[in-house]
Curated annotation (Swiss-Prot):
The keyword tRNA processing does not apply. The lineage of its organism: Bacteria, Bacillati, Cyanobacteriota, Cyanophyceae, Nostocales. Its EC number is 2.7.1.2. The keyword Secreted does not apply. This is Glucokinase. It is found in: Cytoplasm.
Length: 342
Protein backbone atom coordinates (compact mmCIF):
# COMPACT_ATOMS: atom_id res chain seq x y z
CA UNK A 1 0.00 0.00 0.00
CA UNK A 2 1.24 3.48 -0.91
CA UNK A 3 0.29 6.52 1.19
CA UNK A 4 -0.85 9.51 -0.87
CA UNK A 5 -1.82 13.08 -0.02
CA UNK A 6 -4.58 14.67 -2.09
CA UNK A 7 -5.72 18.27 -1.88
CA UNK A 8 -8.50 20.37 -3.37
CA UNK A 9 -7.35 23.97 -2.99
CA UNK A 10 -9.77 26.82 -3.46
CA UNK A 11 -9.57 30.52 -2.73
CA UNK A 12 -11.96 30.06 0.19
CA UNK A 13 -11.69 26.44 1.33
CA UNK A 14 -9.07 23.70 1.10
CA UNK A 15 -9.74 19.99 1.66
CA UNK A 16 -6.83 17.65 2.42
CA UNK A 17 -7.13 13.88 2.40
CA UNK A 18 -4.72 11.03 3.14
CA UNK A 19 -5.34 8.01 0.95
CA UNK A 20 -3.84 4.56 0.70
CA UNK A 21 -3.82 2.95 -2.73
CA UNK A 22 -3.56 -0.80 -3.19
CA UNK A 23 -1.81 -2.68 -5.97
CA UNK A 24 -5.21 -2.97 -7.67
CA UNK A 25 -5.51 0.87 -7.68
CA UNK A 26 -8.25 0.81 -5.04
CA UNK A 27 -8.39 3.96 -2.90
CA UNK A 28 -8.85 3.76 0.87
CA UNK A 29 -9.48 7.04 2.69
CA UNK A 30 -7.41 7.35 5.87
CA UNK A 31 -7.96 10.89 7.14
CA UNK A 32 -9.51 14.14 5.93
CA UNK A 33 -9.74 17.73 7.12
CA UNK A 34 -11.17 20.95 5.72
CA UNK A 35 -9.56 24.36 6.27
CA UNK A 36 -10.28 28.01 5.54
CA UNK A 37 -7.57 28.83 3.03
CA UNK A 38 -7.21 32.44 4.17
CA UNK A 39 -6.26 31.33 7.70
CA UNK A 40 -2.82 30.25 6.43
CA UNK A 41 -0.03 32.27 4.77
CA UNK A 42 0.89 29.32 2.55
CA UNK A 43 0.00 25.69 1.83
CA UNK A 44 3.04 24.31 3.68
CA UNK A 45 1.99 25.18 7.28
CA UNK A 46 -1.52 23.91 6.53
CA UNK A 47 -0.23 20.53 5.35
CA UNK A 48 2.20 20.32 8.27
CA UNK A 49 -0.63 20.95 10.75
CA UNK A 50 -2.79 18.41 8.91
CA UNK A 51 -0.13 15.67 9.07
CA UNK A 52 0.47 16.28 12.79
CA UNK A 53 -3.25 16.03 13.51
CA UNK A 54 -3.58 12.91 11.35
CA UNK A 55 -1.04 11.23 13.65
CA UNK A 56 -0.03 8.50 11.22
CA UNK A 57 3.14 6.40 11.57
CA UNK A 58 4.30 6.88 7.97
CA UNK A 59 4.75 9.93 5.72
CA UNK A 60 3.07 10.43 2.32
CA UNK A 61 5.25 9.33 -0.57
CA UNK A 62 3.37 11.29 -3.22
CA UNK A 63 1.01 14.28 -3.30
CA UNK A 64 -1.20 16.03 -5.82
CA UNK A 65 -3.04 19.29 -5.29
CA UNK A 66 -5.94 20.41 -7.48
CA UNK A 67 -5.84 24.19 -7.89
CA UNK A 68 -8.69 26.57 -8.68
CA UNK A 69 -6.71 28.34 -11.38
CA UNK A 70 -4.08 27.81 -14.07
CA UNK A 71 -0.95 25.73 -13.47
CA UNK A 72 2.10 26.87 -15.47
CA UNK A 73 5.48 25.10 -15.35
CA UNK A 74 4.58 23.31 -12.11
CA UNK A 75 3.67 26.59 -10.40
CA UNK A 76 0.35 28.17 -9.49
CA UNK A 77 -0.89 31.44 -8.03
CA UNK A 78 -4.36 31.40 -6.57
CA UNK A 79 -6.58 34.33 -7.49
CA UNK A 80 -8.00 35.05 -4.03
CA UNK A 81 -4.89 34.19 -1.99
CA UNK A 82 -1.31 35.44 -1.69
CA UNK A 83 -0.09 31.86 -2.04
CA UNK A 84 2.44 31.05 -4.76
CA UNK A 85 2.88 27.31 -5.12
CA UNK A 86 5.90 25.62 -6.66
CA UNK A 87 6.24 21.82 -6.73
CA UNK A 88 10.00 21.91 -6.13
CA UNK A 89 9.66 24.07 -3.01
CA UNK A 90 6.69 22.08 -1.72
CA UNK A 91 8.56 18.79 -2.14
CA UNK A 92 11.53 20.14 -0.22
CA UNK A 93 9.63 21.79 2.64
CA UNK A 94 7.12 18.96 3.08
CA UNK A 95 9.64 16.13 2.58
CA UNK A 96 7.38 14.52 -0.01
CA UNK A 97 9.53 13.42 -2.96
CA UNK A 98 6.85 13.48 -5.66
CA UNK A 99 4.37 16.38 -5.87
CA UNK A 100 2.12 17.55 -8.69
CA UNK A 101 -0.11 20.59 -9.16
CA UNK A 102 -3.04 20.28 -11.55
CA UNK A 103 -5.98 22.45 -12.51
CA UNK A 104 -9.12 21.56 -10.56
CA UNK A 105 -11.05 20.69 -13.71
CA UNK A 106 -8.25 18.39 -14.86
CA UNK A 107 -8.62 16.71 -11.47
CA UNK A 108 -12.27 16.04 -12.31
CA UNK A 109 -11.06 14.24 -15.45
CA UNK A 110 -8.84 11.93 -13.43
CA UNK A 111 -11.55 11.52 -10.80
CA UNK A 112 -13.99 9.95 -13.26
CA UNK A 113 -12.07 6.69 -12.94
CA UNK A 114 -12.56 6.61 -9.17
CA UNK A 115 -16.34 6.96 -9.27
CA UNK A 116 -18.87 4.25 -8.50
CA UNK A 117 -22.16 3.63 -10.27
CA UNK A 118 -24.08 5.50 -7.56
CA UNK A 119 -21.89 8.57 -8.16
CA UNK A 120 -23.42 9.03 -11.61
CA UNK A 121 -26.83 9.72 -13.10
CA UNK A 122 -27.05 8.51 -16.69
CA UNK A 123 -29.11 10.75 -18.96
CA UNK A 124 -28.32 8.77 -22.10
CA UNK A 125 -26.81 5.28 -22.16
CA UNK A 126 -25.57 5.57 -25.74
CA UNK A 127 -23.12 3.00 -27.09
CA UNK A 128 -19.96 3.09 -25.01
CA UNK A 129 -16.64 2.56 -26.83
CA UNK A 130 -13.80 1.81 -24.36
CA UNK A 131 -11.01 3.22 -26.56
CA UNK A 132 -12.82 6.44 -27.49
CA UNK A 133 -12.23 9.96 -26.13
CA UNK A 134 -14.03 11.16 -23.00
CA UNK A 135 -15.39 14.70 -22.63
CA UNK A 136 -16.08 16.68 -19.47
CA UNK A 137 -18.09 19.87 -19.13
CA UNK A 138 -19.10 21.56 -15.92
CA UNK A 139 -21.01 24.73 -15.11
CA UNK A 140 -20.29 26.29 -11.74
CA UNK A 141 -18.68 29.65 -11.04
CA UNK A 142 -17.53 29.45 -14.67
CA UNK A 143 -17.81 26.84 -17.41
CA UNK A 144 -15.07 24.22 -17.44
CA UNK A 145 -14.39 21.96 -20.39
CA UNK A 146 -11.80 19.29 -21.07
CA UNK A 147 -11.21 15.92 -22.62
CA UNK A 148 -9.35 12.66 -22.10
CA UNK A 149 -7.51 10.59 -24.69
CA UNK A 150 -6.36 7.03 -24.12
CA UNK A 151 -2.60 6.59 -24.34
CA UNK A 152 -1.50 3.02 -23.80
CA UNK A 153 -3.29 1.66 -20.76
CA UNK A 154 -4.12 5.06 -19.28
CA UNK A 155 -6.09 8.15 -20.17
CA UNK A 156 -4.34 11.51 -20.40
CA UNK A 157 -6.34 14.56 -19.32
CA UNK A 158 -6.24 17.71 -21.44
CA UNK A 159 -7.71 20.97 -20.09
CA UNK A 160 -9.49 23.42 -22.36
CA UNK A 161 -10.73 27.00 -22.37
CA UNK A 162 -13.80 26.06 -24.38
CA UNK A 163 -16.04 27.93 -21.96
CA UNK A 164 -14.68 31.16 -23.45
CA UNK A 165 -15.80 30.28 -26.98
CA UNK A 166 -18.62 32.38 -28.43
CA UNK A 167 -22.20 31.90 -27.26
CA UNK A 168 -24.20 30.82 -30.32
CA UNK A 169 -27.91 31.73 -30.09
CA UNK A 170 -30.27 29.37 -31.90
CA UNK A 171 -33.68 31.04 -31.64
CA UNK A 172 -35.26 34.47 -31.29
CA UNK A 173 -35.20 34.47 -27.48
CA UNK A 174 -31.51 33.55 -27.37
CA UNK A 175 -30.73 36.24 -29.98
CA UNK A 176 -32.47 38.75 -27.70
CA UNK A 177 -30.41 37.46 -24.76
CA UNK A 178 -27.21 37.91 -26.77
CA UNK A 179 -28.08 41.50 -27.68
CA UNK A 180 -29.09 42.22 -24.07
CA UNK A 181 -25.69 41.05 -22.78
CA UNK A 182 -23.76 42.93 -25.49
CA UNK A 183 -25.58 46.17 -24.66
CA UNK A 184 -25.58 45.71 -20.88
CA UNK A 185 -21.83 45.12 -20.64
CA UNK A 186 -20.84 47.23 -23.67
CA UNK A 187 -18.82 44.37 -25.14
CA UNK A 188 -18.12 43.06 -28.64
CA UNK A 189 -18.75 39.37 -28.00
CA UNK A 190 -20.39 37.08 -25.45
CA UNK A 191 -18.71 33.90 -24.28
CA UNK A 192 -20.81 30.82 -23.62
CA UNK A 193 -19.60 31.02 -20.00
CA UNK A 194 -21.60 34.24 -19.56
CA UNK A 195 -24.73 32.16 -20.15
CA UNK A 196 -23.89 28.63 -18.97
CA UNK A 197 -22.61 29.21 -15.43
CA UNK A 198 -23.80 30.46 -12.06
CA UNK A 199 -23.39 34.04 -13.24
CA UNK A 200 -25.23 33.02 -16.42
CA UNK A 201 -28.30 31.97 -14.43
CA UNK A 202 -28.42 35.45 -12.90
CA UNK A 203 -27.85 37.12 -16.28
CA UNK A 204 -30.71 35.14 -17.84
CA UNK A 205 -32.96 36.05 -14.90
CA UNK A 206 -32.11 39.74 -15.30
CA UNK A 207 -32.78 39.53 -19.04
CA UNK A 208 -36.23 37.98 -18.56
CA UNK A 209 -37.01 40.45 -15.77
CA UNK A 210 -35.89 43.54 -17.68
CA UNK A 211 -37.76 42.42 -20.81
CA UNK A 212 -40.81 41.82 -18.58
CA UNK A 213 -41.20 38.30 -19.95
CA UNK A 214 -42.34 36.99 -16.55
CA UNK A 215 -43.42 38.38 -13.19
CA UNK A 216 -40.80 38.71 -10.47
CA UNK A 217 -41.57 37.41 -6.97
CA UNK A 218 -40.68 39.67 -3.99
CA UNK A 219 -38.46 37.01 -2.37
CA UNK A 220 -36.15 36.41 -5.33
CA UNK A 221 -36.31 40.08 -6.33
CA UNK A 222 -34.83 41.04 -2.95
CA UNK A 223 -31.96 38.56 -3.30
CA UNK A 224 -31.10 39.73 -6.82
CA UNK A 225 -31.37 43.44 -5.89
CA UNK A 226 -29.05 42.92 -2.91
CA UNK A 227 -26.53 41.17 -5.16
CA UNK A 228 -26.76 43.96 -7.75
CA UNK A 229 -26.13 46.58 -5.05
CA UNK A 230 -23.05 44.67 -3.91
CA UNK A 231 -21.52 44.63 -7.40
CA UNK A 232 -17.79 45.30 -7.21
CA UNK A 233 -17.50 44.26 -3.57
CA UNK A 234 -15.11 41.43 -2.74
CA UNK A 235 -17.54 39.85 -0.27
CA UNK A 236 -21.18 39.29 -1.16
CA UNK A 237 -23.86 38.29 1.33
CA UNK A 238 -26.18 36.53 -1.12
CA UNK A 239 -25.94 33.94 -3.91
CA UNK A 240 -28.67 34.79 -6.42
CA UNK A 241 -27.81 31.92 -8.77
CA UNK A 242 -28.43 29.40 -5.99
CA UNK A 243 -31.63 31.17 -4.90
CA UNK A 244 -32.98 31.24 -8.46
CA UNK A 245 -32.12 27.57 -8.98
CA UNK A 246 -33.76 26.53 -5.70
CA UNK A 247 -36.93 28.50 -6.46
CA UNK A 248 -37.11 26.91 -9.91
CA UNK A 249 -36.75 23.39 -8.49
CA UNK A 250 -39.45 24.11 -5.89
CA UNK A 251 -41.71 25.64 -8.54
CA UNK A 252 -42.25 28.67 -6.32
CA UNK A 253 -41.21 31.38 -8.78
CA UNK A 254 -42.26 31.52 -12.43
CA UNK A 255 -39.46 33.85 -13.53
CA UNK A 256 -36.86 31.55 -11.95
CA UNK A 257 -38.43 28.55 -13.70
CA UNK A 258 -38.20 30.29 -17.07
CA UNK A 259 -34.60 31.34 -16.38
CA UNK A 260 -33.58 27.77 -15.59
CA UNK A 261 -35.36 26.45 -18.67
CA UNK A 262 -33.34 28.81 -20.88
CA UNK A 263 -30.16 27.97 -18.95
CA UNK A 264 -30.66 24.20 -19.33
CA UNK A 265 -31.41 24.56 -23.04
CA UNK A 266 -28.15 26.48 -23.55
CA UNK A 267 -26.25 23.99 -21.35
CA UNK A 268 -27.49 21.06 -23.42
CA UNK A 269 -26.64 22.82 -26.68
CA UNK A 270 -23.09 23.61 -25.53
CA UNK A 271 -22.57 20.03 -24.30
CA UNK A 272 -23.64 18.95 -27.78
CA UNK A 273 -21.16 21.37 -29.36
CA UNK A 274 -18.35 19.82 -27.31
CA UNK A 275 -19.55 16.34 -28.25
CA UNK A 276 -19.50 17.22 -31.96
CA UNK A 277 -15.86 18.31 -31.74
CA UNK A 278 -14.64 15.23 -29.86
CA UNK A 279 -17.16 12.43 -30.57
CA UNK A 280 -16.61 11.18 -27.00
CA UNK A 281 -18.04 7.68 -27.24
CA UNK A 282 -16.14 6.98 -24.03
CA UNK A 283 -18.74 9.22 -22.40
CA UNK A 284 -19.57 12.87 -21.85
CA UNK A 285 -19.54 13.72 -18.14
CA UNK A 286 -21.36 16.73 -16.72
CA UNK A 287 -19.49 18.02 -13.69
CA UNK A 288 -19.73 21.22 -11.64
CA UNK A 289 -21.86 22.21 -8.70
CA UNK A 290 -25.00 23.31 -10.54
CA UNK A 291 -26.27 20.14 -12.25
CA UNK A 292 -26.73 18.02 -9.07
CA UNK A 293 -28.75 20.83 -7.48
CA UNK A 294 -31.21 21.08 -10.38
CA UNK A 295 -31.49 17.38 -11.26
CA UNK A 296 -35.32 17.29 -11.34
CA UNK A 297 -35.31 20.16 -13.83
CA UNK A 298 -32.67 18.57 -16.06
CA UNK A 299 -34.40 15.19 -16.06
CA UNK A 300 -37.70 16.79 -17.10
CA UNK A 301 -36.23 19.27 -19.57
CA UNK A 302 -35.11 19.44 -23.19
CA UNK A 303 -31.44 19.06 -22.23
CA UNK A 304 -30.92 15.96 -24.36
CA UNK A 305 -33.01 17.37 -27.20
CA UNK A 306 -30.78 20.45 -27.32
CA UNK A 307 -27.70 18.25 -26.90
CA UNK A 308 -28.54 16.16 -29.96
CA UNK A 309 -30.28 18.77 -32.14
CA UNK A 310 -27.38 19.12 -34.58
CA UNK A 311 -29.00 18.50 -37.94
CA UNK A 312 -27.78 15.44 -39.80
CA UNK A 313 -25.25 14.74 -37.03
CA UNK A 314 -28.08 13.91 -34.62
CA UNK A 315 -27.73 10.10 -34.98
CA UNK A 316 -24.05 10.33 -33.94
CA UNK A 317 -24.86 12.24 -30.75
CA UNK A 318 -27.61 9.77 -29.84
CA UNK A 319 -24.88 7.14 -29.38
CA UNK A 320 -22.75 9.16 -26.94
CA UNK A 321 -23.17 8.16 -23.27
CA UNK A 322 -24.10 11.21 -21.16
CA UNK A 323 -23.68 11.17 -17.37
CA UNK A 324 -24.10 13.71 -14.57
CA UNK A 325 -21.48 13.44 -11.82
CA UNK A 326 -23.27 13.45 -8.45
CA UNK A 327 -20.19 13.05 -6.23
CA UNK A 328 -18.92 16.56 -5.51
CA UNK A 329 -15.58 15.21 -4.27
CA UNK A 330 -14.64 13.95 -7.72
CA UNK A 331 -11.79 16.49 -7.87
CA UNK A 332 -10.30 15.20 -4.63
CA UNK A 333 -10.58 11.63 -5.91
CA UNK A 334 -8.88 12.76 -9.11
CA UNK A 335 -6.03 14.39 -7.19
CA UNK A 336 -5.42 11.10 -5.35
CA UNK A 337 -5.42 9.10 -8.59
CA UNK A 338 -3.10 11.65 -10.19
CA UNK A 339 -0.73 11.36 -7.21
CA UNK A 340 -0.68 7.58 -7.67
CA UNK A 341 0.68 8.07 -11.19
CA UNK A 342 3.73 10.06 -10.03
Amino acid sequence: MTLLLAGDIGGTKTILRLVEISNSSELHNIYEESYQSGDFPDLVPMVQQFLVKANIPSHPEKACFAIAGPVVNNTAKLTNLVWFLDTERLAQELSIPFISLINDFAAVGYGIFGLNKQDLLTLQAGKHQPEAPIAIIGAGTGLGQGFLIKQGNQYQVFPSEGGHADFAPRNELEFQLLKYLLDKHDIQRVSVERVVSGQGIVAIYQFLRDRKLATESPEIAQVVRTWEQQAGQAEKTVDPGAAIGKAAVQGSDRLSEQALQLFIDAYGAEAGNLALKLLPYGGLYIAGGIAPKILPLIENSNFLLNFSQKGRMRPLLAEIPVHIILNQQVGLIGAALCAARL
